[in-house]
């Protein structure tokens, strides 16, 4: 089993959970090996170079995928999916969902996602549009940026991950320190982002939001 890994702060709790889960060593090695940004893992899963990953939510809507109610979600604000004000339109090559979301929301400018976006927003939020905030303003709903998808063995992944949304993940200080240092962020900002902004359980409102987003994308020929 080959698992794709997105090495962003918002999935750090999941990485810690999987490291502690009693998986075969070979599986853990593969999970660490197949790293990539969302757009790369989208292609890797599509061509079955990996067996499962948290991929862009717009990509996860393909009928070929089996999905779990687990992903990257935010409500009212996300801080790490942005459009830079007063810039020319430009997609973030790391993303699929966020580029589509900017079009759905008719937000012009440069799309920026991930840890680099978080750093920029915290430095000067006035320069950026938070796309999750814009989505909530329009719909009153949360947003699902990515979703756990696989091509087979859904029951196995469901068994492995079923306790994750209910588990309080304790991230060792040295890991937080390393992530903060390598992203040029304060530890308190990393903690706030993980504790107060990002969550991973896809429930009824999140499913409603995702259906609405996919429908909007199809209307614009983005999906």
Curated annotation (Swiss-Prot):
Pathway(s) of this molecule:
Quinol/quinone metabolism; menaquinone biosynthesis
Provide this UniProt record's keywords sorted from A to Z.
Lyase, Menaquinone biosynthesis
Recorded coiled-coil stretches: none
Please indicate which superkingdom the organism of origin belongs to. Answer: Bacteria
Reactions catalysed, semicolon-separated, are: chorismate = 3-[(1-carboxyvinyl)-oxy]benzoate + H2O
Q: InterPro entries annotated for this entry?
A: Menaquinone_biosynth, MqnA
What GO biological process terms are annotated to this protein in UniProt? menaquinone biosynthetic process
Q: Which Gene3D superfamilies match?
A: Periplasmic binding protein-like II
Disulfide bond sites: none
- GO MF annotation terms: hydro-lyase activity
What is reported when this gene is inactivated? Cells lacking this gene do not grow on standard rich medium; however, growth of these mutants is readily rescued by the addition of aminodeoxyfutalosine, but not futalosine.
Q: What is its EC number?
A: 4.2.1.151
The record's PANTHER family line, in alphabetical order, gives:
CHORISMATE DEHYDRATASE
HAMAP family recorded? MqnA
The UniProt entry's sequence similarity note says: Belongs to the MqnA/MqnD family. MqnA subfamily.
Functional description taken from the UniProt entry: Catalyzes the dehydration of chorismate into 3-[(1-carboxyvinyl)oxy]benzoate, a step in the biosynthesis of menaquinone (MK, vitamin K2).
Protein name from the UniProt record: Chorismate dehydratase
- Organism of derivation: Campylobacter jejuni subsp. jejuni serotype O:23/36 (strain 81-176)
Taxonomy, top ranks, is: Bacteria, Pseudomonadati, Campylobacterota, Epsilonproteobacteria, Campylobacterales
Its encoding gene is what?
mqnA
